[in-house]
A protein has these predicted regions:
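Gram-negative bacterial Sec-dependent N-terminal signal peptides
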Residues: 2-31
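Surface-exposed loop/turn motifs in large extracellular/passenger domains
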Residues: 34-187, 192-274, 279-380, 385-408, ...
């Protein structure tokens, strides 16, 4: 039986469609001027068998003794199209839609490869929707047994509910992990989309990547020790890798909707590089491309991060990014910036517009681990960052502690480095309450950076 529940949270409304035990939900988020301390963490009872969950497609369960699979790790980059043994999940050949699949994992057993709700190396115009992964190991450890060919981010990561290349629709795919220990950090995606230039595939266009979710509840992810740490590890509701093809500079990723994706993390201890509701890697000037109403929510957790090319914790990033929320509460962030800068932003970088985005940090300590290193890089906290218009963005810091390498807090930034026609930082706001600050901290409501002296509002 399907039930629909709506939660109204102190002038912030989150409409969540839930099927019991889980048909996962598409998140509809409406920004307001109030705080975001009352976001409800989804309490999901994961099924233990396939007959306990409504299934639209196929279902597979692994309890430690079931047969494992050999799967392609890649979501499309032909330079890394290799197979990974001891994997579990579904794979389809080119141009086949696959919707409503369910993966249930109750024991680590010999599982050590990739986990896929569904994957393919070429989707082209069809859909991967409503695929779900449930993992509950009841405190046991899953040990990745990869070789040096272990999957990188560009291959769809370790766990993806849906992973594809050049797909037209990847919606409402979800990963739910509870009471689980991972032997090292690895990427986890609700939906992963790849149009890598090294494969000479066309860019994404007229694509929908919406309503995808990752939920981590009492999860431990240990640091990497067995391979080069520079590979990076990301947890994202949705991830899009779509650079401009090297053979055609005029081809742009456009007409993309990457909205309503989410990450929920509670009572977890994670070593990784980045967390985002919607993580986007694409070139600038990508045409019509929006990333709205995405959410990243971290509660009662410890995140150990920093010194990687993916140094960022945010909600969304796209040329047009509106009404996105990053909320961190009752948590500890341990950030290393010995080599790289780090950013905590509701919107990481918008080529055009960052508007009505919210960043709330409460009852949280941000430790910057390299404070005594004079060459250590800085950490910024920003509501919305754009290269044109940054408007109506808000940062709230409440009862929190900032390390000395946190050197700037900004409601909104408009970076005029590329000298675009409209460089606007308007009506952005920072609210500080009972927050431990230091003498090197810069606080600005609105901030315009140009080749001429900066303008501060």
């Amino acid at each position: 039986m399907t039930m629909k529940k709506s939660f109204k949270l102190s002038r912030v409304a989150y409409s969540i469609s839930i099927a019991i035990p889980l048909s996962f939900f598409s998140l509809q988020l409406m920004a307001s001027d109030d705080n975001y301390n009352n976001i409800i963490f989804p309490e999901i009872e994961a099924p233990s068998n396939c007959d306990e969950v409504a299934i639209l497609g196929k279902c597979k369960k692994y309890d430690g003794t079931d047969p494992l699979d050999t799967l392609y790790s890649s979501a499309g980059d032909s330079t890394r199209l290799y197979k990974i043994e001891n994997s579990f999940g579904f794979y389809v050949d080119k141009k086949q839609p696959s919707n409503g699949n369910v993966i249930i994992i109750n024991s680590p057993g010999s599982l050590g490869g990739v986990i896929r709700g569904i994957s393919t190396n070429w989707l082209e115009g069809v859909s991967f929707n409503d695929n779900r992964i449930f993992i509950n190991l009841n405190g046991q450890e899953l040990k990745w047994n990869h070789t040096n060919n272990g999957p990188k981010i560009g291959d769809g990561g370790w766990i993806s509910a849906a992973a594809a290349t050049a797909g037209k629709q990847l919606s409402n795919n979800s990963v739910y992990i509870k009471n689980t220990i991972f032997s090292e950090s690895g990427s986890i995606f609700g939906a992963y989309a790849n149009s890598a230039s090294s494969s000479y595939y066309p860019p994404f266009s007229q694509s929908t990547i919406t309503g995808n979710t990752v939920i981590l509840d009492n999860v431990t992810m240990k640091p990497n020790t067995s391979y080069e740490p520079g590979w990076g590890a990301i947890v994202a509701g949705a991830y899009l890798f779509s650079p401009t093809p090297t053979f055609d500079d005029s081809a742009k990723s456009e007409s993309i909707d990457m909205s309503n994706n989410s990450v929920y993390i509670k009572k977890s201890n994670l070593a990784l590089d980045s967390i985002a509701g919607a993580f986007v890697y694409t070139d600038a000037d990508s045409g019509s491309f929006k990333s709205n109403n995405n959410l990243t929510f971290i509660d009662s957790s410890t995140v150990n991060t920093g010194d990687n090319v993916y140094n960022r914790l945010y909600s969304a990033s796209a040329p047009n990014s509106q009404d996105n929320v990053l909320s961190i509460q009752n948590s500890t962030l341990n950030i290393s910036t010995d080599k790289k800068y780090y950013s905590i932003r509701a919107v990481y970088s918008a080529d055009k517009t960052a508007e009505n985005n919210r960043l709330n940090i409460s009852n949280t300590t941000i430790n910057t681990l390299n404070e005594n290193n004079v060459s250590a890089k800085n950490v910024d906290i920003t509501g919305g960052y754009s290269y044109e218009t940054s408007r109506n963005n808000k940062v709230i810091l409440d009862n929190s502690v900032l390390g000395r390498k946190v050197t700037s807090v900004n409601g909104g930034i408009s970076n005029g480095y590329y000298e675009k026609s409209q460089i606007v930082a308007d009506n952005n706001l920072v609210i500080l309450n009972k927050t431990n600050m230091h003498n090197d901290l810069s606080v600005k409501g609105g901030y315009i950076h140009t080749v001429t002296p900066d303008k501060t509002q």
